[in-house]
Amino acid sequence: MSCQQNQQQCQPPPKCPIPKYPPKCPSKCASSCPPPISSCCGSSSGGCGCCSSEGGGCCLSHHRHHRSHCHRPKSSNCYGSGSGQQSGGSGCCSGGGCC
């Protein structure tokens, strides 16, 4: 068998397929959490801080003009451990940010 025939038989290994939709949530919360972002619980983004019950998630207000009104983490608006996979959060940081 000639060298040219050997080169035709050799093919590069197949590449791993890239997932079309990457996972929304990280597997676990990072040790250093970022500050509140637009989709989180900062008062400037319509949120109202952290919930004090049911896992300590972040509350988001339905009413942008009434930001002091806080919803407890039984709705999908809360970035807590119970709704983290649905809403993109996995917990609340001590400084008010979401993980």
UniProtKB/Swiss-Prot annotation:
Transmembrane segments: none annotated. InterPro entries: LCE. GO terms for biological process: keratinization. Skin-specific. Expression was readily detected in adult trunk skin, adult arm skin, fetal skin, penal skin, vulva, esophagus and tongue. Not expressed in the cervix, rectum, lung, colon, or placenta. Residues 81-99 have a biased composition (Gly residues). It comes from the Eukaryota. Residues 78-99 are annotated as: Disordered. One of its GO terms (molecular function) is identical protein binding. Keywords: Keratinization. It holds the Pfam family LCE. Belongs to the LCE cluster present on 1q21. Precursors of the cornified envelope of the stratum corneum. Interacts with CYSRT1; the interaction is direct. Belongs to the LCE family. This is Late cornified envelope protein 4A. The lineage of its organism: Eukaryota, Metazoa, Chordata, Craniata, Vertebrata.
